[in-house]
């Protein structure tokens, strides 16, 4: 936000704050997002655990705020369906998720090449995505608890690969997949595999 000249951080919220107050730079802080939403805001940035991010996103949209939310959109299809309904009920509001990989320079170069048709049409693609050492799936934290996270490495990191596949090839309609938690043994997947095909045959 600090890199965008016409944007200014007005207030922040974190459940770990012991009280409400104001930082020395004038930014106000809250423990409860509902108090934050009482502020005069234009944009809401949601960086929360997956169990509460959908509710906060919806609350922001209903307040008439543009919303940027970290991925994933939700823990399951019910979460996502609620957000879609809310967004459709507020057509003037912009909602964006943190699929930052599609803006990497190499990905943009690939998109230009695909659109140019220089190499012909895409026939198939293969993607492999490993976890970051910064993501602690091997420790018992919220990312290993299905009730909070909704899923494991596929939902948290593999979603980037799925997003890029959709960016390059379009929507997939025929999907065969399986997941396992055989490595760490927690309540979420630590390995995921999928074979996907678009209506026009890209695999």
What residue spans do the PLM features occupy?
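N-terminal Rossmann-like dinucleotide-binding module
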Residues: 1-24
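Glycine-centered short loops/turns at secondary-structure junctions
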Residues: 64, 91-92, 117, 201
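Active-site beta-strand termini and strand-to-loop segments that position acidic
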Residues: 194-201
């Amino acid at each position: 936000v600090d890199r965008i000249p016409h944007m200014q951080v007005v207030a922040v919220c974190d459940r770990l704050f012991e009280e409400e107050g104001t930082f020395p730079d004038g930014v106000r802080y809250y423990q409860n997002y509902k108090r934050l939403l009482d502020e005069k805001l234009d944009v809401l940035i949601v960086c929360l655990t997956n169990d509460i991010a959908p509710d906060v996103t919806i609350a922001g949209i209903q307040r008439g705020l543009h919303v940027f939310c970290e991925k994933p959109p939700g823990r399951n299809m019910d979460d996502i369906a609620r957000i879609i309904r809310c967004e459709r009920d507020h057509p003037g509001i912009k909602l964006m998720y943190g699929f930052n990989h599609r803006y990497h320079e190499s990905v943009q170069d690939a998109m230009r090449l695909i659109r140019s048709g220089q190499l012909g049409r895409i026939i198939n693609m293969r993607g492999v995505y490993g976890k970051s050492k910064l993501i602690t799936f091997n420790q018992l934290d919220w990312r290993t608890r299905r009730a909070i996270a909704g899923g494991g490495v596929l939902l948290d990191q593999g979603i980037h690969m799925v997003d890029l596949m959709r960016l390059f090839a379009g929507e997939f309609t025929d999907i065969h997949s399986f997941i396992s938690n055989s490595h760490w043994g927690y309540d979420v997947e630590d390995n995921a595999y999928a074979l996907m095909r678009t209506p026009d045959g890209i695999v």
